[in-house]
Swiss-Prot record:
Pfam families: GDC-P (PF02347). GO terms for biological process: glycine decarboxylation via glycine cleavage system; nucleoside metabolic process. This is Probable glycine dehydrogenase (decarboxylating) subunit 1. Belongs to the GcvP family. N-terminal subunit subfamily. The glycine cleavage system is composed of four proteins: P, T, L and H. In this organism, the P 'protein' is a heterodimer of two subunits. It is an enzyme of class 1 (oxidoreductase). HAMAP family: GcvPA. The glycine cleavage system catalyzes the degradation of glycine. The P protein binds the alpha-amino group of glycine through its pyridoxal phosphate cofactor; CO(2) is released and the remaining methylamine moiety is then transferred to the lipoamide cofactor of the H protein. It comes from Staphylococcus epidermidis (strain ATCC 35984 / DSM 28319 / BCRC 17069 / CCUG 31568 / BM 3577 / RP62A). Gene3D superfamilies: Aspartate Aminotransferase, domain 1, Type I PLP-dependent aspartate aminotransferase-like (Major domain).
Amino acid sequence: MSHRYIPLTEQDKNEMLNSIGAKSISELFDDIPTDILLKRNLNIAESEAETILLRRLNRLAAKNTTKETHATFLGAGVYDHYTPAVVDAMISRSEFYTAYTPYQPEISQGELQAIFEFQTLICELTDMDVANSSMYDGMTSFAEACILALSHTKKNKIVVSSGLHYQALQILHTYAKTRDEFEIIEVDLKGTITDLEKLEQLIDDNTAAVAVQYPNFYGSIEDLEQINNYIKDKKALFIVYANPLSLGLLTPPGTFGADIVVGDTQPFGIPTQFGGPHCGYFATTKKLMRKVPGRLVGQTQDDEGNRGFVLTLQAREQHIRRDKATSNICSNQALNALASSIAMSALGKQGIYEIAVQNLKNANYAKNKFEEHGFEVLKAQSFNEFVVKFNQPIKNINLKLAEYGYIGGFDLGEVSDDFKNHMLVAVTELRSKDEIDDFVTKAGELND
């Protein structure tokens, strides 16, 4: 007997076999040699009741180490931040959750307005003129910024700080493999900060752009004003990869004269998911607007004078003229951009500032605690991350810390021999003083 909700009953199978003139399912596979055909049933357990299955899955999930079971001090590009409850409630609405911006976009006014608000918020944070609708993540945003600089300046050299996230640099090198005469010059660090003397020496008339991270991968705050002074005389573009939460407290890159500001909005409303998805942002000066990758939403008026939103400057995009497009990015991270927009709006300017201040205070408190326990903390101005030197391999330290209920910091020895036995520690607003105290105490015991 057929069941309304369970497909492929015995009756269904027989009806299909009869309609094609086959006597059995095995007859459908007669063309497969019998010596390689499996003749037994698969070793799959019998089905279970939903309640029993749910308990089993919960027991399996309980074996995972997560930020719900452990206090985390891991950052390196993905951070454990507070997400206002309204974020999930809003992005779960079917109008947003299932929406896809069509190529007749004006019929999705709600979606377009949400993207427009995202662009506006990014411009306010970065002190830039124009922002696009989003990118896949911060690292691809960074690579696209370098491509824009090459196209705009007609030069072929990108000077990048070694303080950029190592994965962002890897993506840039991947992009370089697809282009002729594209040179990437990496500037060494002095401690955990870009060596400004070497940077100045490497910038020449053939430099398309200079790129730094703010704060950088090692948590240190670069001197954007001084770097911009080096760049201006050479007519190169200034690219800054910035943590958007830090801009609630730090002077935004646009104020220092940055031409392109990129980054990842993960700190605003996007959870620490394994591998993503994230949401990249891309902001520029007005003069570069027509070379921005991805979609731009603009505000306009209809025939009756009502405010409306449209996709603007679409001739830049790959669906209009693929061979001459500014980029081949098409679909953006609209749902995650919406999550970030809601988080930023819910927090407000003052809320973002207060959370940024709490990150700074917690990180400085943790620094002092590490030093009190005899650790060497690498000296540099920082936001919510810093580097601590250990006597033991970080991998071993982190395995032990997990037993105490902590997710330890990033093992910098995995990306640089210069930082063997060094841990990148992230301390956000969610970490309490008791957690910080106990984490540092346990780390000190393991380091002896």
